Amino acid sequence: MQLQFLGTLASSEKRKKSQRLFFKNIKSTKNKAGKASIMSSDTNVNKSASPTATAEEQPVEPDGPLPGSDNNQEKKVRLSPAKMSTKNSTDLVEYVDKSHAFLPIIPNTQRGQLEDRLNNQARTIAFLLEQAFRIKEDISACLQGTHGFRKEESLARKLLESHIQTITSIVKKLSQNIEILEDQIRARDQAATGTNFAVHEINIKHLQGVGDLRGRVARCDSSIVKLSGDIHLFRQEHRQIEKAIQEFVPALETLSKNLDMKVMQLLGKIETASSEQTSNLKMVQGDYRHEMNLLEFKFHSLSSNLYEEVENNKKWTENQFLKYRKDHLGHINECLKVLQEKLEKSENKMEEKLLQLSSKVENFINTQKQETQLSKVKHMENKLSKKMEQMEKQIWGELETMQNEYQSGFKSIHDSLSSLQQIQKTKMDLEKYKVQKDLKKLQRKIVELQEV
């Protein structure tokens, strides 16, 4: 049994030496200062075990007095399987957080964390190795002191088995952690190579982009020069158009003033003609009254009716002229000339017809007798009424034609003026639209240049 135990201890020592050689390069100067704190934490963890563990920590009393000194007994009491349980020994090992993924470029904080983890693992390994050597020494002392007793052998076997299990589990976990760290280091190296390659490609693209931007800047400069020349030409054209408009405005004002003067003159002529016409009508009526005293009773009604109708026509014509004057003061030049000519012709015709009638009446009065005068007067009254009706119809027709001609002439003048105004407005709108388009294009190109 002792040979088997010593063989297991030798194999464990070989493993420990190989692990020590592997981790000697990783240890730093901080490990020595942290050993005391780790050992104290381990003892505190072992002390904070369950009540069952404290009960098991009590030494097992042998059947008889054991050989050896009191120091050997103290060592036996110190070496109990509960104190060397696998739970408390494995609690010292720190596991790597597998959920944390490595980034392509590891910052300084992550490197510090990796170094801290490696340092902590090295500390735990050193502490566990020291604890294993102590256990080996305690077991050898226990075997020397408890030679020949079965209970102590069984306790030693249990103790060895438990410690061998803890050591194997710790070694397995440490190997797993080492493999994980190696994988992480490889991933970090691959990410670093990838980032270097990406940076090289980005530099190449950046140089290409700078060359393209220089070409674009040169093109933009040439386009800006062209646009500045176009803007200068547009400004000159705009100034010329403004000058033409300013020259055209006073001409229009003079034309409107001339039209107003002509309209006023025509209105004065129309008023004088109407006053002359009324005076002539009054003279004709007075002559008829003096000459036709005999036919006063029968002809009075007709003359009064004619007088009233003529006055109504006169008022109606005056009202019509006033309305047209208020509505269309600036656009009746040609129509008023035609109206004046027709009025003069109608006045001449009326005067001739009145003279003819007066001569005929005088002839009838002189030639016929008083008996035949009544019949002739009746006949003449009928003829006069018919002729007056014809004259009224002719006057009304001429007035309607004059009104239609006046309205058509005014409409043509109004349409021509409105068409001129629309043409001017459309020209101004087109010029404004062109200038706004050019300004928008310039603003867009300036914004693009600023973005570049």
From Swiss-Prot:
The gene is FAM81B. It comes from the Eukaryota. The keyword Coiled coil applies. InterPro entries: FAM81 (IPR029619). Disulfide bonds: none annotated. Keywords: Coiled coil. It comes from Homo sapiens. The keyword Iron does not apply. This is Protein FAM81B. Residues 1-85 are annotated as: Disordered. GO terms for cellular component: nucleus. Residues 164-192, 329-452 form a coiled coil. Belongs to the FAM81 family. Residues 1-11, 38-55 have a biased composition (Polar residues).
